Amino acid sequence: RVQREQEAFNEGLQRDGYMRVFEHTSHLFLKRRDQIVCDELEYAQGKNVLELGSISWKAWIDDNDIEPANLHCINISQEEIKQGERNARFSKVKPHFHLMDAHSLEFEDESFDFVYGCAILHHLDYNRALDEICRVLKPGGRILFAEPLGINPVGKLVRVMTPFARTDDEKPLMFKELTELEK
């Protein structure tokens, strides 16, 4: 699974069609999602932060004037890491980028105050990734993920209209996975 995801992202997904559809549907949910994200991200100020993925920090952290003590961004794709590094060249936030699998994080236990990501968990073996997130999260730490949901009718439509914009192993989250987060 990890190798298939890595290859798909290194080779580049066909996101043009997805972005055209997304432009016409995003107003239905992005404003509220972005407000929730911004409110929650204030917790990351001055904290040790881990992003699963290596792109969202630009919009979520840098563009909102959040300054974590340390920001580590992981990705299994070297191409995605390179994109994150390009974004960081002119940023006041200087993330540390790591080519790393979220199923086996190479960080010490209880290393991070805050772990977040955008549209990443649905690419992973959910339970394995969640175990690793909990392992590296400090007691009292927080997690925040914005993920596609299998129950979202707009998301379903976008997925049907843009099958080549995703990998074979992607699976939108359902209520079952969300309730596991509460544990």
Language model regions located:
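Conserved class I S-adenosyl-L-methionine
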Residues: R1-A44, L144-T167
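Class I SAM-dependent methyltransferase SAM/SAH-binding core
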Residues: L50-S104
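A conserved beta-strand element that flanks and buttresses the S-adenosyl-L-methionine
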Residues: Y116
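A short His-aromatic
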Residues: A119-H123
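A short glycine-rich, Lys/Arg-flanked "PGG" loop and its adjoining helix->strand segment in the class I
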Residues: R128-R142
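Short alpha-helix
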Residues: E170-K183
